Design a protein with these regions (language model features):
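Gly/Ala-rich beta-loop-alpha elbow adjacent to hydrolase catalytic centers
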Residues: 96, 100, 104
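Conserved alpha/beta-hydrolase "acid-adjacent" motif
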Residues: 223-229
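Active-site loop/oxyanion-hole signature of alpha/beta-hydrolase fold enzymes
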Residues: 54-95, 262
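Catalytic active-site module of serine/aspartate enzymes centered on a nucleophile-bearing elbow/loop
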Residues: 240-283
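Conserved alpha/beta-hydrolase catalytic His-Asp/Glu region
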Residues: 151-197, 204-206
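Flexible "cap/lid" loop of the alpha/beta hydrolase fold
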Residues: 109, 116-147
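Conserved HGGG/HGGXW glycine-rich cap/lid loop of the alpha/beta-hydrolase fold
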Residues: 6-66
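Short beta-strand/loop motif that positions the catalytic acidic residue
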Residues: 210, 216-218, 222
């Protein structure tokens, strides 16, 4: 299995699907391995066979080592940059969801030349500009590691990631994802290491320094990272497009299986055209 090693000795695992000339990096959220993406790489390749999809496991998840010490979101962004080095990729389109969106922001700020285009899903700039989740959602999130192996984990996860109307369909919507996290859950210490990094995350006014074409996606029913966070990001990243998905919660790719493929296709078209569009809201 391929790995890169960070300066602190942490080994970061990654995998690659496709052998095309257009690299796309998928970065997942808190406590999740790259297996979280399930059939998203297949859908991307079905849409565009010229893609090369890179899937890093964030430190502490999947086959990556748990970090030897506490770290920041920017540390994980540097990990992704090292993966790009190992893959001989100069620059890629980067898709990040939730914490993965925070990593993607830091990657675009710290390694500008490595990011050709950006898709930020269900994510936040952090305090003081971002909006906090409701306390009920935060409490549900913090009890997640202790619930994952239990039978009621499906409804526990659904209450956090899906609109209430979709709770009865949780197993159908997640389609194998719950089984995955029940059989190979993240270690609680690794989960809270990542959570500490998320709590310290902020990009603030620096977000205006992101210069690559950017699409920002949110669900209007996201109970974990309120849509106002995405609105703020889209208003301050030059030329960013905001996509608001009706009836969708935090688990955007689970509720809309093709949203990543659609958005990456639009992003590649924008970069290929070489034009910067004015911000607009797309329903």
């Amino acid at each position: 299995m391929p790995y890169v090693t960070s300066p602190d000795g942490c080994r970061i695992h990654y995998s690659v699907q496709g052998a095309g000339s257009t690299p796309v990096v998928l970065v997942q959220g808190l406590g999740l391995s790259s297996r979280f993406w399930f059939d998203v790489p297949d859908r991307l390749l079905a849409e565009n066979s010229d893609l090369r999809i890179v899937l890093p496991d964030n430190r502490g998840t999947g086959f990556s080592d748990r970090s030897p010490k506490l770290f920041r979101v920017r540390t994980m962004a540097d990990d992704v940059a090292r993966v790009l080095d190992a893959c001989d990729i100069d620059a890629a389109h980067v898709v990040g969801i939730s914490m993965g969106g925070m990593i993607a922001q830091q990657l675009a700020l710290r390694h500008k030349s490595r990011v050709k285009g950006l898709v930020l899903m269900a994510t936040t700039p952090g305090l003081p500009y971002g909006r906090l989740p409701p306390m009920k959602s935060l409490a549900t999130l913090l009890t997640m590691p202790s619930k994952l192996r239990k039978e009621e984990s499906a409804i526990h996860i659904a209450k956090l990631l899906l609109p209430e109307a979709e709770w009865p369909r949780a197993r159908e919507i997640f389609d194998g994802w719950i089984d995955l996290i029940q059989t190979s859950p993240v270690e609680p210490r690794a989960f809270f290491d990542q959570f500490a990094a998320v709590c310290a995350h902020w990009t603030g006014k620096e977000i205006a320094d992101i210069s690559c074409p950017t699409h920002v996606i949110t669900g209007d029913s996201d109970a974990l990272i309120p849509p106002k966070n995405s609105e703020w990001l889209s208003q301050r990243i030059p030329g960013a497009e905001l996509h608001v998905l009706a009836g969708v919660g935090h688990a955007i790719p689970a509720q809309d299986r093709d949203v990543v493929a659609r958005t990456v296709s639009r992003l590649i078209a924008r970069v290929g055209g070489g034009t910067a569009e004015a911000p607009r809201k797309v329903a």
